[in-house]
Amino acid sequence: MEPSASCLPGFFMVCILLKITVLTQVMSLDIQINTQIPDTEEGVLVECTAESLFPPAEMTWRDSKGNIIPPSSTFDSQDRAGLLCLKSTILLKNRTEGPITCSIYNKTTNQEKRRSIILSDVLFRPQYMSLMSNNLLYLGIYLIFILFLNFLKGILFCLTKRLVHFRKRMIKIKKVWSNKTRACCPLIWEFLEIVLFIAFLPLYLMFRIRVFTLDEAHILYNNWLWKVCKTLIAMMILFTVLILFLLWTLNRYGKMPCLSSMNIDVSTHDAEQNSSKSAKFQENYDVAGQMILETYEETIFCQHQESCEEYNYDPLLLSSLDALGTCEDEKFSQHQESFEEDEDLQSFSDFKIELYSKLGNLTH
């Protein structure tokens, strides 16, 4: 009897300790508080959720002065183990001073656990509410615009690398535009994307959900985030200016990588066209030169023949053939001497230059 009697106090003590441990463990679970902007109503919807609570338990909302805030909706359920799951929401249409507290009170254990949040005044502005209600729409438009710019950039890159028709059009555009104007196009393209990426960060920090767990250092955290944002913006702007300056310097000295490949392709294409044109022009030039020389020789021969026919020879000569031969020799020598003179040579060179210029105009 003594051993059994001595075990009873220990058994009851263990049961009490287990019960207290379970109850304290249940009440020590975290309370989750979420906020969202409803699409239909104006205001901020605050939701408090707690799970695995030992029944019976109550959930109440209080402001900074301790006044009870009536909930907009409540929900409770039990799991297989008999533990409660509570969920309560309130709709705040006006800004509040100080924290808002969600408390859970257990009547059996006479324990209460609280969780407080601070809502920023920005959440109650109409501009913020309209923006946050369509936050996914604005984010989708932003991403679509970025993808569209990158898609256009890829199309232009493929066209400049493969299609000859696009190169011909680019050659015409380059003849109209100056070198500085051509350099500004890729710079503006890259600068636009950089500006969009830079502008997204402050917009996110300005219109994000500013809900802080009650903490003495939440103001310091907020200021620290804004300082980090300003530092990042300053660094991005500085590096953007440096990159644009380097691109402008490279383009000024004709060493810009983005335009060098295009210039090389265009120069090779122009060289091929010029070589084919020069070959055709050389062939036409040789043929026309031979024709001019033949016609010039024929005119000289005709002039000699006419001069020989007009020549009055002596009938006492042995034969007319000898007279014609001597006449031709004399006229040929005279003509050769006349070509040796400066005036005749100058006229012949002028005549030749004039014929070549006419030939060049005909070939073009």
From Swiss-Prot:
SUPFAM superfamilies: Immunoglobulin. Residues 160-186, 252-364 are cytoplasmic. Keywords: Disulfide bond, Immunoglobulin domain, Membrane, Signal, Transmembrane, Transmembrane helix. Disulfide bonds join C48-C102. Its main location: membrane. InterPro entries: BTN3A2-like_Ig-C (IPR053896), Ig-like_dom (IPR007110), Ig-like_dom_sf (IPR036179), Ig-like_fold (IPR013783), IgSF_BTN/MOG (IPR050504). Pfam families: C2-set_3 (PF22705). It is a multi-pass membrane protein. Residues 29-118 form the Ig-like V-type domain. The chain crosses the membrane at residues 139-159, 187-207, 231-251. Residues 1-28 form the signal peptide. Residues 29-138, 208-230 are extracellular. It is found in: Membrane. Expressed in skin and thymus. One of its GO terms (cellular component) is membrane. Encoded by one of the 11 copies of Skint genes clustered in the D1 region of the chromosome 4. Belongs to the SKINT family. May act by engaging a cell surface molecule on immature T-cells in the embryonic thymus. This is Selection and upkeep of intraepithelial T-cells protein 11. It comes from Mus musculus. The lineage of its organism: Eukaryota, Metazoa, Chordata, Craniata, Vertebrata.
